[in-house]
Amino acid sequence: VSHILSSCTIVINGVDRAGQGQPGVSSQTEIPGKTISIATFKPQNNGTADVVINMSNFHNRYGGTDQSIILGSAEMLNQSFVFDLLFYNLTCTVLLLFSIFFIVLHLNYKKMPYILWFAFTTITISIRISVFYPHILAYIWPTIPWKLYFILRYSSMPLAALFFTIFIKKIFNMQYQYVYFGIVIMCILSTAFIVITPTLIISQYLYIQQAL
C-alpha cells in the first residue's frame, strides 16, 4: 500500500500484518503515518485470502492512497522496492552533490549570486523527492514529526518555484517585474500558509496549490 500520509492497518485473514501510523476514531486517537506498508502473507487452504485495509484521515482530510495496491510474490515486490529505493536514493544524492558544488562555486565567485539560488532549488527538489515514494527521509529519520514531514512534503513545491524564479531573475534580468514579484509573493504566501495553518485546514486547499 503506497504512502497515504494518513494512517492504516492491513488485516489479512484476521491478522494484523502491517500498517502506517495508527488509525483512530478521532484526531486525538489517530497517529498518522509517513511511509509505505508492505505485508507478507500466505493464502488460506482454499487458495483465497481476506484482505481488509482500515484507514483514517483525521489529520489529513484528503489523505488516501492514489496509487495501485500491488499484489505479487514476496521476492518480486522486494526486488522492485529495493530498486526504487536505490534509484531515488541515487537521485537525491546526485542533486545534493550538485547543490554542494554550486554553493562552493558561489563562495569562490561572488560575482555570480544566481548560482546560490540554483543550489537552493536543487536542495529543495532533493527534499521533495525524499518525502515521496519510497520515502527515503522516513527511513533515514524514522522519528521525524509527522507535522514536519507534512510541511516538507507540500512546501517543497512553492519553495522550489520560488528559488528557481529568483535564479531566472538573477541570470536573465527579467523585464516584467510584476510577473516576477507576483510569482514570488504567491510562493511565499503559499509556503507560509502551509507552515502556519493546521494540517486539517491545509489539506482542504492543497488541490488549489496543485492546480496552480
Residue positions per predicted region:
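Aromatic-lined ligand-binding clefts that engage carbohydrates, nucleic acids, or primary amines
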Residues: V1-N13, V51-I53
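Juxtamembrane segments at transmembrane-helix boundaries
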Residues: N89-L212
